[in-house]
A protein has these predicted regions:
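Surface beta-strand/loop "capping" patches
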Residues: 144-194
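Catalytic-core regions of glycoside hydrolase
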Residues: 1-134
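A beta-strand/beta-hairpin structural motif
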Residues: 197-198
Length: 198
């Protein structure tokens, strides 16, 4: 993901306009043509190129709901009334990333407010979260968060039928996660005998 932080309160120039922002994004798109890139907000270029989005305020309800609002409706960014595009179904084609907010403690997010944290993650269709991690004393909550992330593939049915070369296998796989599997990857099935040989 890429985050742009401009500390204008420290005297730095404000965020450049859309044309300049798009030049930066175009450089990344050219440099990483097969990668799934993410942006902090649903800028128009993110919608145009089906980029993923990134929420750095996970666990904070007000900020996450604002972020989800940008995704649902698009709208203003700074002085630009049409800088953000509505991208309500982007997560079906590109990943959602994020990190836990620094404004709340892990004790809150992974303890007493865990149901809220999980609800916000589910609404976001989050694929990954990092880099901030919880201490081992919050393992139960952290594991619940991990179960809420990304894709969760499982085999729901296996059919074995005789065929000319031995046995043919047909697998049915379900995704029970909050996000799809974004790449077409081949599936390999290995069969072992009792001795562990394939």
């Amino acid at each position: 993901w890429g985050e742009w932080h401009i500390k204008s309160e420290d005297g730095l120039v404000p965020m450049p306009d859309e044309a300049i922002r798009d030049e930066y994004a175009a450089d990344y798109l050219a440099a990483f043509p097969t990668a799934k890139l993410l942006m902090r907000r649903p800028f128009n270029i993110a919608a145009k190129h089906q980029l993923g989005l990134y929420n750095d305020m996970n666990g904070e309800e007000k900020d996450t709901m604002e972020w989800l609002g940008w995704i649902a409706e698009g709208g203003w960014y700074g002085d630009e009334p049409h800088a953000l595009s509505a991208m309500p179904t982007f997560w079906q084609d590109a990943p959602v990333g994020g990190e836990f907010t620094s404004s709340l403690s892990m004790r809150d997010m992974l303890g007493k407010k865990l149901p809220r944290t999980l609800r916000l993650l589910e609404a976001s269709h989050m694929s990954f979260i990092g880099p901030k991690t919880a201490s081992v004393k919050y393992a139960k909550g952290y594991n619940a968060v991990l179960k809420q992330l990304g894709y969760r593939l499982r085999v729901t049915e296996l059919k074995l039928t005789p065929c000319a070369d031995g046995v043919c296998a047909e697998l049915t796989v379900a995704n029970e996660g909050a996000a799809p599997f974004y790449w077409e990857w081949p599936v390999n099935l290995y069969v072992e005998d009792a001795a562990g040989s394939t």
